[in-house]
Amino acid sequence: MNIRETPADEKIKISKFNFSCDDVDDTIPKPLPQILNFFMLVCGRPGSGKTSLILNLVCKRGKMFNKKFDKVFVFSPSLMTMNDEPFGELPEEQVHTDLTIDNFQTAIDSIANTGEKILFILDDVVNDMKKSMAIQTLLSKALMNRRHLAGAGGSTSFIITTQVYNKIPAPIRKTASHIILYHTRNKKEIETIYDELIVLPKEDFYEILKYCFDKRHNFIYIDINKSYDKMFHKCFNQLEFNSQNDTGL
């Protein structure tokens, strides 16, 4: 097919506008997101290590995302039952053992126009999501608009965990900016990830998974914002490989 283009009127000029929600925090180590409006989806079976990963990312003093947020909201039936209570100092209204339309809407309302940097942790509440279409709709809307939920100067990030990637409703999981996947033998889960996110030949993707899952608690980290040959990491180590973009895009 031959494609030609005719230049537009030179008066049409599109330039970039800067948003405070896109400010870069270069004290956060790469390849973790340095712009605090990310949505990280962490997928792993019980015992895979996903809870330990979250605690290391958020609670480890002086590391990674520790002290990077003005407020942290936790929705989890299990994180608050740990012996050392890693989120024990959070105000009562920021901690919930389940996810409901009321407590999530209240949290969203409380951050509006605050200009604060906010983190939501939704740990093992997939069943709560699936109980109510209203929750799914509200959560999906919040995720799509997360850059602006806290108003000018603010930003909102989400970390959501699930035992299986495709147990998260599609409109929600498709807004993720970063995916962490622990070892899985669930063919449907892998196929869904491949169909939705991956443009490599399937056999190459399986080779990458095999390389990443060589030890029990290893994971593959996928940065959706990167090009097809830069998006894959074994744990947080950048992978280099020879492959092609199947779509040509």
Where are the regions that the model predicts?
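Short, flexible N-terminal segments of the mature chain
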Residues: 91, 96-100, 240-244
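N-terminal pre-Walker A segment at the start of P-loop NTPase domains
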Residues: 1-29
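Conserved P-loop NTPase motor cores
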Residues: 40-62, 67, 77-81, 96-203
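An amphipathic, basic-hydrophobic helix/alpha-beta surface used to engage anionic
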Residues: 72
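Residue-level signal for well-ordered alpha-helical segments
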Residues: 19, 31-34, 156-158
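P-loop NTPase motor core of the ASCE superfamily
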Residues: 2-3, 24, 28-47, 53, ...
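Short, aromatic/basic amphipathic alpha-helical patches
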Residues: 83-93
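Alpha-helix initiation/capping motif
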Residues: 80-83, 100, 223, 237
